[in-house]
Amino acid sequence: MAPDIATSPEKQKALNLVMTQIERSFGKGSIMRLGDATRMKVETVPTGALPLDLALGGGLPRGRVVEIYGPESSGKTTLALHAIAAVQQTGGIAAFVDAEHALDPAYAAVLGVDIQNLLISQPDTGETALEIVDQLVRSTAVDVVVIDSVAALVPKAEIEGDMGDAHVGLQARLMSQALRKITGNIGKTGCIVIFLNQLRQKIGVTYGNPETTTGGNALKFYASVRLDIRRVQTLKKGTEEFGNRVKVKVAKNKVAPPFRVAEFDIIFGKGISRLGCILDMAEETGVVNRKGAWYSYNGENLAQGRDNTIKYMEENPEFARNIEQLVRQKLEMGAVVSANSVAANETDAEEEYVEEE
């Protein structure tokens, strides 16, 4: 007679056994409970946006492949440059493979990147770019490598050929071969490899999402973290646009529960609004209260409107540090905010947001 496994303890025992076997076969993090709040002990690098760090379970994981994709001007390069700045601030070495030949050193410096010590390469072909990435990773000296972007990794055969020549699947094969070669070394050296990618439209798709990323399917499989970044609001003062509100969805995460969403501001010419992130988290955790347009702390009004409150925090850095410390304490105690809860499956249209004068 077959054993009765309908009872809850028996099922739990069987579940624990199969999860252990799967993790033993395919590695730690290959399966986990979606509601598990504890993150794996993987070293991470902050992204510059506190809500995104929460959504990722700590930050960008070391020794992993990360893909950041989204429409044009959504903040992909800005996010990558903030990660480079965070690595450099801890004494790490960063490299930027500029396949698009579009890096703005002045903007990178504003974001905190040490451009004097940033390694930069502007390769002519995709093969050269990926070979440079492989050698940098194998050197064990580099902590983060950013490739901007996958779409610009043009195979040598395509460059040497004529306009109009068909090169079906050439870039996809190149990416697949390169990732097979690079991935093992990345895990051993602890280097973060960040691929920035563009979106394309699939032709003839009637049902489902017509968007896809360039470079074939290999990167989707090899990436431990995939971030989908979208512009959802245009920030304005009167009629003047001064930034974007962006939403980042963690489309894939092998080191923490996926499908979380983070929202934050990117200010033109300044990058991610760190104080804006702190204020949003302070409001969600109850450190700062908002009634109508007024923000208050310990019963005392700070300023009217979000923009004015951020300005107040800029003028009072000690107060801002105190608020950040209180927010982090609340989060460490398990406070649930929008960034560490599972995302709703919805499509948001881009909106305009007008700040108070």
UniProtKB/Swiss-Prot annotation:
Signal peptide: none annotated. GO terms for biological process: DNA recombination; DNA repair; SOS response. Keywords: ATP-binding, Cytoplasm, DNA damage, DNA recombination, DNA repair, DNA-binding, Nucleotide-binding, SOS response. One of its GO terms (molecular function) is ATP hydrolysis activity. ATP binds at residues 70-77. Transmembrane segments: none annotated. It is found in: Cytoplasm. GO terms for cellular component: cytosol. PROSITE patterns: RECA_1, RECA_2, RECA_3. Gene3D superfamilies: P-loop containing nucleotide triphosphate hydrolases. It holds the Pfam family RecA_C. Belongs to the RecA family. Can catalyze the hydrolysis of ATP in the presence of single-stranded DNA, the ATP-dependent uptake of single-stranded DNA by duplex DNA, and the ATP-dependent hybridization of homologous single-stranded DNAs. It interacts with LexA causing its activation and leading to its autocatalytic cleavage. HAMAP family: RecA (MF_00268). This is Protein RecA. The lineage of its organism: Bacteria, Bacillati, Cyanobacteriota, Cyanophyceae, Gomontiellales.
